[in-house]
Amino acid sequence: MILTPDDISNFLYCPLLPKGTEVVYKKNTFFESCVGEAIKLAERNCLLKDSVLNNKKIITAWDNIWWPACPSQNIDFKTAQDLTVKASRYFLDYCKYDISDCLYPTIAVNVESQVNINSTILKTHIDMIKVDLSVSNKNMVLVDFSKKDMSSIDIALDPGIRSTVLSFSQGKNETIQYMLIQPNSKTNKLVITSAIFRPKEIENIRKMVSYVEQGIRRNISYGNRWQCKECQKCKSFKYLTNNDSL
């Protein structure tokens, strides 16, 4: 059997879990998606050519993505120009963040990973992987452009994101930072929000995913009070109220 982070998220509707923990992902607009794709393309090109990222390179990537796609979205030339100016401000913001400099080198773009959980394969995807060289143990940074309007707490508690972190974990002493990068239309700024997952937390995630995998495989609905009965297993994880990631 193959599972995805969405499968994990959709399955966790146990009534024993704290109320208000469900996260509904807001979809990106076409413009927001193109902003993320332009940054990824520029990062990938720099990685392949072993060159340094700058605003001009992101704008070049933007032009290759944006203008050919505008006709299919019925975006007129004037609107396309205005949005290009807006996008350029986001790209300038990105280049000002530490995440774009040599302390956070990009090692891969559009990456898929998988991990065996019991008799099941958990398959995940992340937009970009960077390494944080500002710390002695070189922490992994997972960069996501696909979600928006999530706080650090939302990121830390979301079952799908936690499953993704687990699949990219390489060792017991590894700390992983999950970073969400999104344009903010209200402030016209590129916003970076993140949560840090330490080794102990990642081990708790493994236990949670293992338990959910068994429920899916055995067709046990954790959202059915009749089937849950007096079971306190979900509550025993405390993974939705643990502050280790914040």
What is each stretch, according to the model?
Residues I2-L3, E22-E32, I153-I155, I220-W226:
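Structural motif
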Residues A38-V111:
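A non-catalytic, helix-rich entry segment at domain boundaries
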Residues M1-D6, N10-Y25, A61-P71, K138-L142, ...:
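Short amphipathic alpha-helical segments and their helix-coil junctions
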Residues A108-V165, I205-M208:
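Non-catalytic protein-protein interaction segments used by genome-maintenance enzymes to assemble
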Residues P5-S51, T84, E230-K233:
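Nuclease catalytic cores
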Residues D6-P18, C34, D50-A69, E174-K186:
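Short, compositionally biased low-complexity segments
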Residues L41-N45, V165-Q170:
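Active-site catalytic microenvironments for nucleophilic, acid-base chemistry
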